[in-house]
């Protein structure tokens, strides 16, 4: 098989006249003349075409002319969120909280000299001090430090942006959460993932990071139908955020998924304002009012960083908690009808609502590694009522970060983890709450059913069992409840590496009885070590770990 490099050499392409750049083994960036030459002589070579420019769309801005001096304490041990955006103005009141890097080459510095720094500064203002600017959006997460990489002033080519992001990630391994509020006006393809989204997915499969990406805006003056999202909002491993108004309805500029006609994007929604109810930000010009998905995403970056860096949860569990809190019990009851625009739903404002559960609920976290075909734990002692029945409705959310292959088109993800959760039947099989019959002997689910009903090949799984009559379900003798995670590889190669997954499971007592202590006791008797998440204690642990020890 002839490589692309050898083919270009064989075609006698003049690399001085026609400059081109390789990004991986099968992706090149070319100018228009070379593209036309290749299209004429080797049309089979061009299987996927990406738009060359990511245009950063700035929302309408309304000045607030606030002149009062704002006092902010110096940063201490707060965690750091990475921001990749337009340039940052170091002269704003929270400048000490931002480690700013103008990530520009010499030519870009000359071209961008004196350019506007509004957008990038506004994004970092939400991450650092968003609750002070918008008291009604106080999430209880406090302030965050920012490492801000200004990669452009207004426009940047997709391949150049991704090259910069690769370098930035490689040199800043201490940061786990990255905010990317940039995107294209062009709709993503129905047939393949965009180049920039594929790069972000690859980075997240390889490294312990999560990108939070804005769902992009519809900036047309006349809207004829709803546009699909622009890249890189088709990134599968990232958390893609769309925007809603204060009442939870989609913003007027909302764009939609799904991706490749299947994958659920956006993931979630949050408050990003609208033309007549804007979000307060701070820029070089003082306080301003803006709207857009760009200003919804940073709030989710705050929550995600809090869960990972302060509470100490793995990224897979943190993402599952975010998704689960958005879906709640309402998703299966009808909210799923708006999934193309709202994703799994609107995330609660207060972080405590993500980390806590109601008194009648039992919620627990499972974090594990898929090392083989099946990863199973059957010993989950769910409490029964006086009639020896299980008086619960249940839901579960699982997230993982698989390797992906853009060249496979719609068959994008390489690895599938299928989850079952429910009562263990006498034959040892799990009576799954989602009636998942995949991989059961004697039963068959075709590919269409597996994708539609069980979300096969999707890296976020949400399953729920809601009993309309709220009747308790029978127990199978002394059997317990179980979790089964089954791994499948799309490609013919064997599974070469372990894949971490995080699951959040919630049981709600239909009669409103608090059975959490019974659950903890039963788990302890079976040898489980049960650790309740104490947020205040985790904050103390985090602060202690950040203290510097000076040896005499």
Segments predicted by a language model, with ranges:
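Extended low-complexity, serine/threonine- and proline-enriched intrinsically disordered segments
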Residues: 1-11, 393-456
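C-terminal edge strands of extracellular/lumenal beta-sandwich accessory domains
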Residues: 412-426, 472-473, 477-552
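Subtilisin-like serine protease catalytic core
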Residues: 70-102, 110-159, 206-208, 235-237, ...
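C-terminal subdomain of the subtilisin-like protease fold in secreted/lumenal serine endopeptidases
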Residues: 311-391
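Substrate-binding/access-modulating region of protease and related hydrolase catalytic domains
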Residues: 151-231, 290-291, 295-296
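Extended, solvent-exposed segments with strong compositional bias
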Residues: 355-367, 428-475, 489-494
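Autoinhibitory propeptides
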Residues: 1-73
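Extracellular S/T/G-rich loop segment that most often corresponds to the catalytic His/Ser-adjacent loop
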Residues: 87-95, 228-305
